[in-house]
Amino acid sequence: MEIKIATRKSPLALYQAEAVKQAIIDKHPDCICKLIPLDSEGDKDLRPIHELGGKGVFVKRLEEALVMGDADIAVHSLKDVPADLNNEFQIVATLERANPSDSIIFKESITLDQLEDKSIVATSSPRRAAQVKLFNPSLEVCPVRGNIHTRIKKLKDNEFDALVIATAALDRLQLNLENVEKIDSSVMLPAATQAIIGIEVGRDINPQKLEIIKSINHHETYFIASVERKIIKYLEGDCNSAIALICKKIKESTFEVNLRAFDHKSLKVEKIDMCFIEAELDQFYLELFNKIEDLKIKELISN
């Protein structure tokens, strides 16, 4: 059985595709897995994501490969996949979630607390930018695009003073950099599905191949991802929305959700922290969505 795996060409994307390939081979040694590296619009055009039409710019080219039969599956950083997925496609498996935190890289040996006023912190994420400004309003934020190595080079070339990057990306690429600080979740909460590798298929995938893909699914991560994606879908957030969200297991069958929503202009923030039992998921959604409406969070993030 051959499985063709569509992936973006960036070093991080190729690592993630290789991780999926290895997971398949470990469970199904007779499988032949072939990577299909592709250029996405978001990789070729380095304008701000909102000018390109939103997060989907990282997945459209891979979805085209699924439709055309050039690939059987597409591997993504799940946070790049729109929560309102086209009906032609579905996320059928995830690998185990890595560390979901963010890290900040400095040019010198300092900490986030020690960044001087007016220091420039690079990130193109409205979520990260809002939380940086809330932590220290005197800091300045500038946008940055390109793959991780490109962004780190810009830091070394003194284009800014610090750079915020997902911890999982640094870990996966084994970038043992100096002057790196993991940012505590009390300062910076991650994006929904951050650090989760997702596997997307078309609705007409070969049933045998589908079963192979489902066999590598990490069920707890998949459940957590589905919760986070459902909440993001309800919020109707887009690439300009400053939303931080994480669901995590705290004990058997019990989960906690932490939501932070920001108006990135005024820096007003609304917070929701709730726990739920897996068997009462529908009731949890009802209560959470009512709170979202009461706090007018949709209006807040659309400002």
Residue ranges and their predicted role:
Residues 1-40, 45, 51, 134-303:
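Small-molecule-sensing regulatory modules
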Residues 48-73:
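Short, structured active-site "lid" loops
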Residues 57, 64-65, 81, 86, ...:
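Extracytoplasmic loops/domains of multi-pass membrane proteins
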Residues 61-62, 111, 150-151:
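Short acidic active-site motifs
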Residues 67, 72-77, 161-166:
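Paired acidic/hydrophobic, glycine-rich loop segments that form the ligand-binding mouth/hinge
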Residues 78-79, 87-138:
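A conserved helix-loop-strand patch within extracytoplasmic ligand-binding domains
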Residues 78-81, 168-170:
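Short glycine-rich anion-binding loops that position phosphate/pyrophosphate groups of nucleotides
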